[in-house]
């Protein structure tokens, strides 16, 4: 899944700091070259100790091999329950702000935009799979290059050394919140769901049938 994203938010408790289960996914994110935005949540909890939490987070990043740039992470303080966030750990000031806009502003400011090419030959890598009794196997992935349409003929490849195999897309869907909606086109940069191809695996590349090219297969831990 991390191969589909351009940035990550690391949510840490203002009292407890990074939890043991945080370590695995953080290591993966850092290895992907992603620069986390750290969100110190529950800043209004009694006993909140944001300075200690940030030191613990810095130490965790350092132990996981973070680069100097990744260690220089932006920080947002928030209370998700009460709906406010900002760049200060002063709770009274955060209450005056009264909204979560600071998180969205941080995403816009710090998450880089990929140079995806919507006009090149199609390249879409499947990163996860779902299943429906109605449409069968569903592939989820990001369009790395080009455009894709419903009912279009494509090629699928399992890695650069794989043999291109002809296939046909049925539906294309996009996420809209927790829902899925059918669309008539998707292009480079979009995260989509495709139906109609039963031979999909994690890491399969859906590519242009006339110019087949595959990304390296993904490793799954």
What are these regions (language model features)?
Residues 1-221:
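Structural and coupling elements of P-loop NTPases
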